[in-house]
Amino acid sequence: MFKLTEKGEKIQEMFDTIAPRYDFLNRLLSFGIDRKWRRFAVKQIRYAEGGRILDVATGTGDVALEIAAQTPASISIVGVDFSKEMVELGKEKVNCSPFAARISMQVAPCEAIPFADGSFDSVTIAFGIRNVVDRAQGLKEMHRILKADGRAVILEFSTPRLTLFKALYHFYFLKVLPVIGGLFSQFSAYKYLPDSVMEFPSQEEFKAIMAGVGFKNLKHFDLTGGIATVYVGEK
């Protein structure tokens, strides 16, 4: 059985704690743009009739639900997350949706995905790879569970390149966001968010990590001036 590191356990505990306010704060702090980003990311997936899609770090199921909305009824979706509280909330959302029969969710970390090799047509992870302590291992697992020519789609925060926009972004992300997040939830969690984004690799560096575990045909898309990035790779 995979054991989280001490850092991983702290991150897991943090997400368990903020789970009840997670969706609300996502909408508030991103001004609702996160929904647009997820829609764009899901448009990049690949699947065959009757295929399966895996959403890693599924949280409360936003991406899993978006996948269901964009794909035929023959497609089944599995969501996994290392936070039990997030998964429980996600199950409630899914059960209240029109897609309950197509989506299943379970607790599992990215570094030890509990499915056989070559099980899925595509794998997605949105705003989650940044929180995986052993990113290379997480990416290896995502690569492993893909079918041949399967596609990985990764949505993650990034740092804008334009100087003025970057300055405004840093002010909001480092000064404003933790305060607003702290008013409604846990301050330390929303202090962790910008810190983790600042230390995340650049787009080219991250694509090199993906290539290192076997992904090919790599590309990325900058969204909203580079605030977020979608990475696409194939097995």
Swiss-Prot record:
Q: Which SUPFAM superfamilies match?
A: S-adenosyl-L-methionine-dependent methyltransferases
A GO molecular function assigned to this protein is: demethylmenaquinone methyltransferase activity
Tell me yes or no: is Transferase among this UniProt entry's keywords. Answer: yes
Chain positions recorded as S-adenosyl-L-methionine binding sites:
T60, D81
Q: What keywords appear on the UniProt entry?
A: Menaquinone biosynthesis, Methyltransferase, S-adenosyl-L-methionine, Transferase, Ubiquinone biosynthesis
* Record-linked PROSITE patterns: SAM_MT_UBIE, UBIE_1
Pathway(s) it belongs to: Quinol/quinone metabolism; menaquinone biosynthesis; menaquinol from 1,4-dihydroxy-2-naphthoate: step 2/2; Cofactor biosynthesis; ubiquinone biosynthesis
Please name the CDD domains in this protein's record. AdoMet_MTases
Name the catalysed reactions.
a 2-demethylmenaquinol + S-adenosyl-L-methionine = a menaquinol + S-adenosyl-L-homocysteine + H(+); a 2-methoxy-6-(all-trans-polyprenyl)benzene-1,4-diol + S-adenosyl-L-methionine = a 5-methoxy-2-methyl-3-(all-trans-polyprenyl)benzene-1,4-diol + S-adenosyl-L-homocysteine + H(+)
The protein's Enzyme Commission number: 2.1.1.163, 2.1.1.201
Query: Which Pfam family, giving just one, matches this sequence?
Result: Ubie_methyltran
User: What GO terms describe the biological role, i.e. biological process, of this protein?
Assistant: menaquinone biosynthetic process; methylation
**Annotated TM spans:** none
Tell me which PANTHER family the record gives.
2-METHOXY-6-POLYPRENYL-1,4-BENZOQUINOL METHYLASE, MITOCHONDRIAL, METHYLTRANSFERASE
Q: Which family does it belong to?
A: Belongs to the class I-like SAM-binding methyltransferase superfamily. MenG/UbiE family.
**Any idea what job this protein has?**
Methyltransferase required for the conversion of demethylmenaquinol (DMKH2) to menaquinol (MKH2) and the conversion of 2-polyprenyl-6-methoxy-1,4-benzoquinol (DDMQH2) to 2-polyprenyl-3-methyl-6-methoxy-1,4-benzoquinol (DMQH2).
Q: Report the protein name in the record.
A: Ubiquinone/menaquinone biosynthesis C-methyltransferase UbiE
Report the gene name: ubiE
